[in-house]
Every structure is written in structure tokens, then in C-alpha cells.
């Protein structure tokens, strides 16, 4: 087995073979060292994992109340800069932590669940009882559900403490979190840059260690792109793996509840809790749920070639025009590192890949035009008076919904209209079938497929807000996975220049339906041999 330090340092570059459709990578160079400031921050602010929190509670070293106080203190210091949360439930979190401590003292740690004392951020399009749930929209300002979304309920039952509701692009429609009806979230690596979206608040909260883990939703990349931008782990499960009950619908055939963590182990732990069939969601699967964390192998038990015999395909269409040079280099280095770990890595073409983006926006907007028709401004949100019901509805929607949401509703209504249904919606569904077929055929040849999670690192706030086509192009790497209903994991794999300490880049790993366990196992091996999970943003060194 190679020495751990050597394994941490070695990321390998590539050599292209002549075939335009199939290329292999060979190991020839090394991973750049992490920026000095980043390493210093990591030493000063070691991330508290789910396991370390549980060990602290078990040993009596810290109480749930003390852990909660530490996280809330950090949240208060960093939130004025990051603005990850729409609502912080600090008093409720403190009460829940004190109650946990009482139960631990009388019933024991096992009785309170595997996530006892773990602070969780919840994207604000997931319903939470006794806590505002706005979907990032002013049309739901003041809405407070009487129930928890299934994913939230399962976390609470496992002992987790919901610290608050994280910011998002309105109803999940956006890629920067600039589209929120409440505030603009910033990237903890550089507060002049976007955290990605639409789950930007959930990603930035984990990156800034304001909470241990967080929930997001992914309709076309809304977990994976922010994970890449913020340097955290993000998981989009298979469609149906996690219940959508209590998730405010954007595009029902594409929406998935996902999660963020500062490590693959934490992400796997959360998935084990929230996954599984739910009678409240007719699309949820009854496929068996594994104890995903128990399937992960620690670094000291890894073989010298832990991925020996595995075949990995790197999607050719994700390394071409429109992708930043630094991102391509990071992904090729990561692919070469996977090869060094024993796998065979080949570049493979998916001919229908480029068709996915326009098909996605037609389908997602069409479903949104139906799903959002339920919001009328009558019981909550911004209500505008009118002479009749139609004027009241129209005025309230015009005043309560943001520009991007209105634009997508119009696009979807147009695509569904009688004169254009066949030309747009029906054709987009045919493209979706082609995309599914392409992935199915590729995943019959390869164990997983890999690509960048985004064509760039995090860009400046305001840089693309007035250019919707440029914004939509940022989803190129991710939307096809939603069209195919597949699971995907994003793990930090390197840095590009930018900010004071570099900007993170994420590697997207894509698997067959319900292969989350395999993705997490590969991601964990990759993560351990690079130690990316110990990289924390400069914000924490400064706060």
C-alpha cells in the first residue's frame, strides 16, 4: 500500500490517445498542494463529523447543548457574510439539545437515535412544522406548515436538530441563489462569488460549518453544482430513493431530495436515514435501503489498488467547448488518480448528451407551469387587491413571484399549448428517452461515469444574472442525470485560481439506478486518498 501522504499528494495528469471517441488516461504528474491558508484553516477548524459528535456524547466530553452552542456561535459570526439561512431556529435548537441531553442521561445514547446532537440545515422548499417554509418566494411569505416533510421527519426521529431553513433560488429555479425572494447567499470561499444553486444556502452552510449536514433538492443539478462551487460533498439519489412528500414541487418527474456533508461518510449516514419507501409519496421506491456508512472502507484498511478491476467512463462531451481549462485539468487529474487506484478509465461519448439541456428546460418549465398554479396569494404572501377574483390572483402572482419564475411559467405554458405541444413538449420527451438509453448503454460497459459537476468554478455575483442563456448553460453537466433518473455524487477534487485561496472544483460520479452504495464507496476511497474533506474555506480562519 502506498504511504498515505503520497496518496494524498498524487493526482495524475493525462495523455490523450488518438481515437476521437475513446481515450485513456495515464499517470504522469502530481496533485498541487492545497493553498497554505486553506491548510492553516483546516488545522484550526477541524470539521466535526457525525461520528465525532457521537463519540463526544458517548464519552461525556461534550453535551448536545454544548455542541449546539458551538455551531450557533459560528453561525452568528459567519452569517452576516454568508447569508445561508432565511430563518434560524436558534432558540428551538437550544431547547431540543437540552431535551436530548436529558434523554441521554436517563435512557442512554442509543435511545435517542444515530444523529443525536447533529445540527441540520433544511432547504426552505422542504416543509417543516412550526417553522416558516417559503420556497424562497414572497408569495409564500408567512407560510408555516403543520407537518414535516418525510425527509425532515426521519432526521428528527433519528435525533437530528434542525437549526434553520436555508436560502434558495425561488422554488428551486436558478443556479446561483441570486433568485431568492429574500437575500443573496455568498460563497464561503469568496464572498464576492455565488455559491451555486438552487440549493446554495444548504451548500454554503455546510461549507462554512454553520451546520454539520444539510438537505437540498435537485431537479437539474441543484445539489451537485453548489457542492462543486462550495467544496463540499453533494448527493443526488436515484429518483424515488427518497420521499418527495413535503417538498414544494417544481418539476415532479425530475425533483429529488438530496443532501450535503463535509465528507462522504456524513453524506452516507444521512442517506441511510432519509431513504426508503413512503406511503405518502406514490413515486417513492420500495427498493431495499442499505446501511451505506457500514459499506465504506477506512483508509488504513484499503488495498494498494482498491479500485482494481473497475471500469470508469469519463463523458467526452463534458470536456469540450464551454468548459473552463482549469476545470478540465482538475477532472483529468482526478480521472488519472482513479486510474492509479486500480481502475481502467476511458473517455466515452454519449451522443445524446448535448440534447439534454434544451429538453430539460422545456420539460421542467412545463411541469412548473402546472405545479405553481396552486399559489394565489389568498391565505399568505403578498396579496394585491382587485375588483374581482381574477384581478386579485393576477396581481398577487405578479407581485409575489420573481422574474425567473414568471419566465419559466411562460415558457412552460407556451410549450404545452395546443399549437406547440408536438413541436416542443412531445419532442423533449422523446429526447429524454434517448438520454435514458444512452446512459443505460454506457453503464452496461462501465461501473460509473464521471464528469465535471459544472463547466466552471464559482463566478462573481451579478456576472450572469442578466444572461439567462449563460446561466442555463451552467447546468449542462447535471440535467441529463435528472432526465435519466440516476444517482450522482459530487466530491471535491481540486482547485482553480480565484479568490484568496483558490476555488473548489467537484468531480461528478454517476451510477446505475439505486447504486448509491457503490458511488459512496468509490467517492470515499477517492476522498480519503486526497483528503479533500479537510479543506475548509478561508472564511473560517477569519471568523
Swiss-Prot record:
Stored InterPro entries: Amidase, Amidase_CS, Amidase_dom, AS_sf, GatA
UniProt GO BP: glutaminyl-tRNAGln biosynthesis via transamidation; mitochondrial translation
Origin superkingdom: Eukaryota
Signal peptide: none
Miscellaneous comment as given in the Swiss-Prot or TrEMBL entry: This protein may be expected to contain an N-terminal transit peptide but none has been predicted.
Function statement: Allows the formation of correctly charged Gln-tRNA(Gln) through the transamidation of misacylated Glu-tRNA(Gln) in chloroplasts and mitochondria. The reaction takes place in the presence of glutamine and ATP through an activated gamma-phospho-Glu-tRNA(Gln).
Protein's recorded name: Glutamyl-tRNA(Gln) amidotransferase subunit A, chloroplastic/mitochondrial
Gene that this polypeptide is encoded by: GATA
